[in-house]
Swiss-Prot record:
Recorded GO MF terms: NAD+ poly-ADP-ribosyltransferase activity; tRNA 2'-phosphotransferase activity
Primary gene name: kptA
Organism from which the protein derives: Rhizobium johnstonii (strain DSM 114642 / LMG 32736 / 3841)
Biological process, per Gene Ontology: tRNA splicing, via endonucleolytic cleavage and ligation
Keywords for the protein's UniProt record, in alphabetical order: NAD, Transferase
Protein's recorded name: Probable RNA 2'-phosphotransferase
Enzyme class: transferase
High-level lineage: Bacteria, Pseudomonadati, Pseudomonadota, Alphaproteobacteria, Hyphomicrobiales
Function: Removes the 2'-phosphate from RNA via an intermediate in which the phosphate is ADP-ribosylated by NAD followed by a presumed transesterification to release the RNA and generate ADP-ribose 1''-2''-cyclic phosphate (APPR>P). May function as an ADP-ribosylase.
EC number(s) per entry: 2.7.1.-
Length: 184
């Protein structure tokens, strides 16, 4: 059993190299974002005192389910800034989705809607509680935005859902947003 601090550090590093900087660990992702688990294991072993079993434990116990491990290959489920194709299928969203952010972002969002910024998609939550957890990672006061996903979908916008249940959209125009979801 590895210490929680090391587990967190290894998990964050895995997210970093599998989503943003595979070169930093000497890895090459395929077009779908996959890399050989053996290659990742070697890269992690050169930086951390961690076993194959401990890496698997990190993947399986990650509360956010950030990774998928299949057929001796691994990838991050979403949040990439490197160019990959997750081969996501379109899905009909629930009536409402939610986005947690900091209050300081509200002026920009109110003018321009939610943009994907450096990522491939805007990340949305299926419930207010998850959005609150996301918002808590931001500095300052937090707000939870409600997305009228049913209307957005009916008006031709596409939604996708990742392997770990995060809803994804290219953008969320301002007319589909309201600020009163679970916040004062």
């Amino acid at each position: 059993m590895m210490k929680a601090r090391l587990e967190t550090e290894v998990s964050k590093y895995m997210s970093y190299v599998l989503r943003h900087a595979p070169d930093a660990a000497g890895l090459t992702l395929d077009s779908g974002g996959w890399v050989s688990f053996d290659e990742l294991e070697k890269a992690l072993a050169s930086k951390y005192d961690v076993s194959r079993a401990e890496i698997i434990e990190i993947v399986e116990n990650n509360p956010k389910k950030r990774f998928t491990l299949a057929h001796n290959r691994i990838r991050a489920n979403q949040g990439h800034s490197v160019d990959i194709d997750l081969a996501l299928n379109q899905a009909e969203p629930p009536a409402a989705l939610f986005h947690g952010t900091s209050l300081t972002n509200w002026q920009s969002i109110e003018r321009e809607g939610l943009k994907k910024m450096q990522r491939h998609h805007v990340h949305l939550s299926a419930d207010v509680e998850t959005a609150k957890i996301v918002a808590a990672r931001r500095k300052g006061e937090h707000i939870i935005l409600r997305v009228d996903a049913a209307r957005m979908f009916s008006e031709g916008h596409s939604f996708f859902v990742s392997d770990n249940g995060v809803w994804l959209a290219e953008s969320v125009p301002v007319q589909y947003l309201s600020r009163n979801a679970g916040t004062p």
